[in-house]
């Protein structure tokens, strides 16, 4: 009887008996049909199509004939001479000899087939005659009747036995070592072929006594179908820039913005138009009659107001404008944006919040001026007064209107007016370009100095911002080096250097800036898994895109299909493990999420979920529990759980309860306590740390398991990543360019990797398999297992032990490189603490962020829960997903490592915004320092900072008040830099009144590691402080008056301004006869017509008349009472009250001095609107300045300022020669120092005392290309 040809690799297929051998009835027709089906498209390598149809030798014949075919592969002993004279390692000779021997054995087997023909013949009549011998083909394996057609049964049997994958020649199950016979499964050496056959049978590689289990086949089918089209096995070929960029960066900050207009934030506004009689109309409007443009407004009164970028020409609007209306209008809204209840009066603001609102206004002022002055080119002026100066060419159709404002000295008229007199006194040659050629090396020079209208404060802010960007600038050579370092040389980066091209590429960031930004990210995570989990998912997707490793679960199914099991077995180990590894109801992205977790072991602890542990602790007698233990043992080393080793140990200890006992030193954490509960270092059993405490007699398996863990648990290592010299490093507890790994790292093969069984994870898997074999071999633990089940289990473990998966080698060689390549570009840089392996004393127990300096005693009363943030996120992973990936990894057949990574990595580095995260870190650092500085101005944080605004009223901000203020700072920074995601949000929770940022982690032994990043300095903070110092001198320009006000009747015909009152009208606490109305003062009304008496601050009863001083708070709390009692005395002039304000917004009401004016209506309305939580803008009545004689009428003033607060007045009667009546002011030459003083250096400024309105402005002609525009990458 002929044997149906089977695919073989020179050995048994591993499926036991050939079930079709019993079903073969000798029919030539059936043999032909089966041969045509079996051999279709299944051609063994090295054989012809004709040879495929020849009958094949028996299993033992082929084994003996090909015993030397793979000797060098099995013994790994190349170069030695075997017993037949062949050189080991010469695969050509050995394979040819094996093929010849196999062919001879086949011929001998074919000759013997005629002698083995059946003695019983069959005919078709037997089917209908029960008394005749029926055909054996109608009987199934159990002896029952089988009505399926023979062709169907043969096809089913063939598909169950024969692999659909091409066979490989030369993989026999055994090989001769020269000194014995070696098993290729466990490498054991036997002394005779019979001993070897018996040994091979123990692995489940039986000959004709067993057959492939239908249970295995069913589970293989279900296993393959369940994995079909699963995302983990789909390798995406799409590595386009856009999709990769979405994973690598969030918003691109708007760091570089340009302004081609005027560099000024202060605008001269006409307040009152010129009022002149008809007889001098032509004289006054001489310049208008001849269409001569004036550099300044021609008005009776003009003032300076804040209006950022009022003459700008920008490429992007930072949307942080500070626009102040003229003082004749109400500007109270600028001082009530923050910390003012919506129920307050529309016209009022809380005076205790003035300082916070002023600080916010100054921050907006600075943010709206973070522009670079753009170089726009020049043209020579042909007008006579500029002496051929080179004036800047402005873009836009309305450029002409700006020249008179930019260059006041271009005007020249014989008219007599304050404007013309000012122009005549100017230095004529300080106009236009200054001391710099326009062309440099054939291109526009990178910077140029220009004399033009600008204010010194805006020029200083933009100059500091430009200097900050210049410090961040990197040249193409540095870019080339940095990108090559980050890409580990897999991408060839070149940078052609062109000296004539001026580039500004601000990507250099310091370590301190990145560390501060990293701490903010860590605080953002806190203990919230929903924040970090998307980050890990994105990294896992990115790893899948660039990795050559492909997860192919058919490797597992094909391996299990070679396991031999008896048909009489009630349990199937191979079927059981296949069922365990199916992807139902599991997140099978856990494998690459676990790899991503390696980058963040300082804040994320990846653990194995409870469902992966044996149910209720499990039992060693359960096959299901044994596979749970196997899956768990393979997956645990890939997690970042520092307690993973003890969990692995206790998992088996749980299963051994009742069989083996180990000494446990904790009454709560006993041997029966679930292994997942051992999640902290104090729960580690002493016997696990000192395995000598485990008796090798009472607990031999657990002693062996503990020894395996201590010896074979993977060893941590590290790899270089990033370019900290250029891009900085966010590492906090590790060196700047070190990336830690929980397993050993070996250099990768730069060409084609080959299968390697010497890596740590493969050794670990082998030891786990050997341990399980010891378990199943011992009848003490498996008393109910039959020998067939034990053999099947051992065979399954041997298959898993030597499964041809590339994943362990990938994890040791390529995965670290992939992590190191993508780590420098991640929005969340790696945050790691050292991996400790089995060193319990070094296990990190706490990672926290502190906002307060511990060495400062005088701190606000803060709660530790709001100033210290403990971070840490446990992230549960499915052990089955990790184990599937470990057992089923493969590489593309044509893989060349360096070529693969060049193609995969290049699109990431070719993205134009790949390193925008560095700029974001710089902005985060700026925002943090700005917040700390500003909060220190309104609360006591002991942070060393100059407080220029202490004279402005403010309460001592609480945590909630400071948080509201911090929220506005955060919003302003995000708006200015065009950011939509989180910036300072982590600092808004808790208490933002911080003095420093520090992070620490503590080990189990009590040792604490603290990192306090040094604040590297913030240009935004410096600019805000500069603006505050200027505000301290030039507060009137910002709509704020300083000092107090005096309420009392003053009638006069003298045309003076209440913002600059005569000195004799002002009194203070030191003035004789002045009384102070304190908090404990009382009013005693007189009896029988006597005047009321008041007990003053000294306790004396004095009449309520004369000069008094009231604190503003006292007036606010008693506003209704005081208004009713004091208005009569104030109106009659018998009572004058000085209200101590400190600082206050004001509003001007101009009146015609020729008409009688009384300010009581303004005063009474203002008094009525005062409330305990708000005050309106203080109204002042000011006469209009006149350039001719007038008849002045009496004016009654009720509110005057105690200090000079008229610095915002620019000029009166600017189109006239002089002011005759009313306040008089000429164009302030002190604000045009370099234009009017020939001895002043051209670059001299007078900040912070005076804001100059004409300066030298440096303008730049830089290009700002992305990194990818100046380097050429070759994939």
Curated annotation (Swiss-Prot):
Disordered, as annotated region: 1-147
Main EC class of this protein? Answer: hydrolase
Biased composition (Basic residues) is annotated at 1-12
Which cofactors? Mg(2+); Mn(2+)
Its Enzyme Commission number(s) read 3.6.4.13
**InterPro entries in the record:** Lamba1_VP3, Lambda-1/VP3_sf, Znf_C2H2_type
User: Where is the protein localized?
Assistant: Virion
* One Pfam short name: Lamba1_VP3
Q: Which reaction does it catalyse?
A: ATP + H2O = ADP + phosphate + H(+)
Parts forming coiled coils = none
Q: Does the keyword Nuclease apply?
A: no
Keyword list (alphabetical) reads: ATP-binding, Capsid protein, Helicase, Hydrolase, Inner capsid protein, Metal-binding, mRNA capping, mRNA processing, Nucleotide-binding, T=2 icosahedral capsid protein, Virion, Zinc, Zinc-finger
Here the segments flagged for biased composition (Polar residues) are: 55-66, 118-139
- In this chain, the C2H2-type zinc fingers fall at 181-203
Q: Which GO terms describe its biological process?
A: 7-methylguanosine mRNA capping
Q: Does the keyword ATP-binding apply?
A: yes
Query: Basic and acidic residues bias located where?
Result: 18-35, 80-98, 105-117
Kindly list the GO CC terms recorded for this protein.
viral inner capsid
- Report the GO molecular function annotations: ATP binding; ATP hydrolysis activity; RNA helicase activity; zinc ion binding
Function per UniProt: Inner capsid protein that self-assembles to form an icosahedral capsid with a T=2 symmetry, which consists of 120 copies of VP2, with channels at each of its five-fold vertices. This capsid constitutes the innermost concentric layer of the viral mature particle. Displays NTPase, RNA 5'-triphosphatase (RTPase) and RNA helicase activities and probably participates in transcription of the viral genome. Helicase activity might be involved in unwinding or reannealing dsRNA during RNA synthesis. RTPase enzymatic activity represents the first step in RNA capping, which yields a 5'-diphosphorylated plus-strand RNA.
Which family would the database say this protein is a member of?
Belongs to the turreted BTV-fold inner capsid family.
Q: How does it assemble?
A: Homodecamer; each decamer is made up of two conformers of VP2, called VP2A and VP2B. 12 homodecamers assemble to form an icosahedral capsid. Interacts with protein mu-NS; in viral inclusions.
Kindly provide the name given to this protein in its UniProt entry.
Inner capsid protein lambda-1
Instruction: Specify the species.
Output: Reovirus type 2 (strain D5/Jones)
Q: What is the lineage of its organism?
A: Viruses, Riboviria, Orthornavirae, Duplornaviricota, Resentoviricetes
């Amino acid at each position: 009887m002929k044997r149906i040809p089977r695919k073989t690799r020179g050995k048994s297929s591993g499926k036991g008996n050939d079930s079709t051998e019993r079903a073969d009835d000798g029919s030539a027709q059936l043999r032909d049909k089966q041969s045509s089906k079996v051999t279709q498209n299944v051609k063994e390598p090295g054989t012809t199509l004709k040879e495929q149809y020849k009958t094949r030798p028996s299993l033992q014949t082929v084994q003996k004939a090909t015993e030397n075919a793979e000797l060098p592969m099995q013994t790994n002993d190349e170069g030695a001479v075997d017993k037949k004279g062949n050189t080991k390692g010469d695969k050509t000779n050995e394979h040819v000899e094996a093929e010849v021997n196999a062919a001879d054995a086949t011929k001998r087997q074919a000759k013997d087939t005629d002698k083995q023909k059946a003695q019983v013949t069959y005919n078709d009549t037997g089917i209908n005659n029960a008394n005749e011998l029926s055909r054996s083909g109608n009987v199934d394996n159990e002896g029952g009747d089988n009505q399926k057609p023979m062709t169907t049964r043969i096809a089913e049997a063939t598909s169950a036995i024969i692999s659909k994958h091409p066979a490989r020649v030369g993989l026999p199950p055994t090989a001769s070592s020269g000194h014995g016979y070696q098993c290729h499964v466990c490498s054991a050496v036997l002394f005779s072929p019979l001993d070897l056959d018996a040994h091979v049978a123990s692995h489940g590689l039986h000959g004709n006594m067993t057959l492939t289990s239908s249970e295995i086949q069913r589970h293989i089918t279900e296993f393959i179908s369940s994995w079909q089209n699963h995302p983990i096995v789909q390798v995406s070929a799409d590595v386009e820039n856009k999709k990769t960029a979405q994973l690598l960066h969030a918003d691109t900050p708007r760091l570089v913005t340009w302004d081609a207009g005027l560099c000024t934030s202060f605008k001269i506004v006409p307040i009152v138009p010129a009022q002149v009689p008809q007889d001098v109309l032509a004289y006054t409007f001489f310049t208008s009659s001849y269409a001569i443009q004036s550099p300044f407004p021609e008005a009776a009164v003009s003032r300076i107001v804040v209006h950022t970028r009022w003459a700008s020409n920008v490429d992007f609007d930072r949307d942080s404008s500070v626009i102040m209306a003229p003082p004749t209008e109400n500007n109270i809204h600028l001082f009530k944006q923050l910390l003012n209840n919506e129920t307050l009066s529309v016209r009022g603001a809380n005076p205790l919040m003035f300082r916070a609102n002023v600080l916010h206004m100054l921050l907006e002022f600075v943010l709206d001026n973070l522009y670079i002055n753009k170089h726009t080119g020049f043209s020579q002026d042909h007008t006579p007064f500029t002496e051929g100066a080179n004036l800047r060419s402005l873009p836009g159709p309305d450029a002409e209107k700006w020249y008179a404002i930019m260059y006041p000295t271009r005007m020249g008229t014989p008219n007599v007016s304050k404007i013309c007199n000012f122009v005549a006194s100017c230095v004529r040659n300080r106009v236009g370009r200054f001391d710099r050629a326009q062309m440099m090396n054939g291109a526009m020079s990178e910077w140029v100095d220009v004399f033009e209208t600008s204010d010194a404060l805006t020029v200083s802010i933009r100059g500091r911002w430009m200097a900050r960007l210049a410090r961040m600038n990197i040249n193409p050579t540095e870019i080339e080096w940095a990108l090559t370092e980050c890409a580990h040389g897999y991408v060839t980066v070149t940078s052609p250097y062109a000296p004539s091209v001026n580039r500004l590429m601000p990507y250099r960031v310091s370590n301190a800036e990145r560390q501060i930004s990293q701490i903010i990210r860590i605080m953002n995570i806190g203990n919230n898994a929903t924040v970090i989990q998307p980050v890990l998912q994105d990294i896992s997707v990115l790893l899948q895109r660039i990795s050559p490793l492909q997860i192919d679960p058919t490797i597992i199914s094909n391996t299990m299909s070679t396991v031999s099991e008896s048909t009489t077995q009630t349990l199937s180990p191979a079927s059981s493990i296949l069922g365990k590894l199916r992807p139902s109801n599991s997140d099978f992205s856990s494998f690459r999420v676990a790899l991503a977790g390696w980058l963040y072991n300082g804040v994320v602890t990846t653990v194995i979920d409870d469902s992966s542990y044996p149910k209720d602790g499990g039992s060693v007698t359960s096959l299901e529990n044994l596979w749970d233990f196997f899956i768990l043992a393979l997956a645990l080393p890939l997690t970042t759980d520092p307690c993973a080793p003890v969990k692995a140990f206790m998992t088996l200890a749980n299963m051994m309860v009742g069989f083996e006992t180990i000494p446990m030193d904790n009454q709560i954490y006993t041997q029966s306590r679930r292994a997942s509960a051992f999640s902290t270092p104090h729960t580690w059993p002493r016997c696990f740390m000192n395995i000598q405490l485990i008796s090798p007699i009472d607990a031999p398996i657990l002693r062996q398991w503990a020894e395996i863990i201590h010896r074979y648990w993977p060893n941590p290592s590290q790899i270089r990543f990033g370019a900290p010299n250029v891009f900085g490093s966010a590492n906090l507890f590790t060196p700047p360019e070190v990336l830690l790994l929980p397993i050993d790292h070996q250099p990768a093969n730069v060409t084609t990797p080959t299968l390697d069984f010497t890596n740590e994870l493969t050794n670990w898997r082998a030891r786990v398999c050997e341990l399980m074999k010891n378990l199943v071999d011992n009848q003490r633990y498996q008393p109910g297992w039959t020998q067939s089940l034990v053999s099947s289990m051992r065979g399954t473990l041997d298959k898993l032990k030597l499964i041809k998966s590339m994943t362990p080698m990938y994890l040791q060689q390529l995965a670290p490189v992939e992590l190191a390549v993508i780590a420098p570009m991640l929005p969340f840089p790696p945050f790691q603490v050292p991996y400790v392996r089995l060193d319990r004393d070094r296990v990190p127990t706490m990672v926290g962020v502190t906002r307060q300096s511990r060495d400062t005693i005088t701190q606000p009363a803060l709660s530790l829960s709001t100033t210290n943030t403990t971070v840490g996120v446990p992230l549960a992973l499915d052990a089955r997903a990790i184990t599937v990936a470990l057992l089923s990894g493969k590489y593309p057949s044509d893989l060349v490592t360096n070529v693969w990574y060049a193609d995969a990595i290049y699109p990431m580095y070719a993205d134009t915004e790949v390193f925008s995260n560095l700029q974001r870190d710089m902005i985060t650092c700026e925002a943090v320092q700005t917040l700390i500085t500003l909060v220190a101005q309104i609360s006591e944080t002991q942070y060393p900072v100059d407080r220029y605004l202490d004279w402005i009223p403010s309460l001592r901000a609480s945590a909630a008040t400071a948080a509201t203020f911090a929220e506005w700072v955060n919003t302003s920074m995000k708006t200015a830099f065009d950011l939509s995601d989180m910036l300072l949000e982590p600092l808004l929770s808790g208490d933002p009144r911080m003095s420093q940022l520090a992070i620490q982690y503590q080990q189990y032994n009590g040792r604490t590691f603290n990192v306090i990043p040094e604040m590297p300095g913030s240009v935004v903070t410096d600019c805000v402080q500069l603006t505050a110092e200027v505000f301290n001198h030039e507060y009137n320009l910002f709509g704020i008056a300083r000092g107090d006000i005096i309420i009392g009747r003053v009638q006069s015909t003298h045309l003076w301004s209440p913002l600059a009152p005569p000195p004799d009208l002002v009194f203070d606490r030191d003035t004789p006869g002045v009384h102070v109305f304190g908090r404990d003062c009382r009013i005693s009304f007189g009896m029988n017509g006597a005047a009321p008496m008041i007990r003053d601050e000294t306790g004396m009863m004095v009449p309520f008349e004369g000069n008094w001083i009231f604190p503003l708070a006292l007036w606010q709390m008693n506003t209704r009472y005081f208004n009713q009692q004091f208005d009569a005395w104030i109106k009659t002039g018998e009572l004058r009250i000085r209200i101590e304000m400190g600082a206050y917004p004001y509003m001007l009401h101009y009146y015609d001095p020729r008409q009688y004016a009384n300010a009581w209506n303004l005063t009474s309305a203002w008094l009525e609107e005062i409330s305990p939580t708000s005050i309106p803008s203080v109204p002042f009545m000011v006469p209009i300045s006149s350039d001719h004689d007038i008849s002045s009428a009496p004016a009654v003033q009720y509110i005057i300022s105690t200090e000079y607060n008229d610095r915002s007045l620019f000029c009166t009667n600017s189109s006239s020669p002089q002011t005759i009546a009313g306040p008089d002011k000429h164009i302030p030459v002190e604000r045009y120092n370099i234009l009017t003083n020939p001895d002043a250096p051209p670059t001299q400024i007078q900040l912070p005392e005076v804001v100059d309105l004409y300066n030298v402005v440096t303008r730049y002609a830089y290009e700002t290309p992305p990194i990818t525009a100046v380097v050429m990458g070759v994939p």
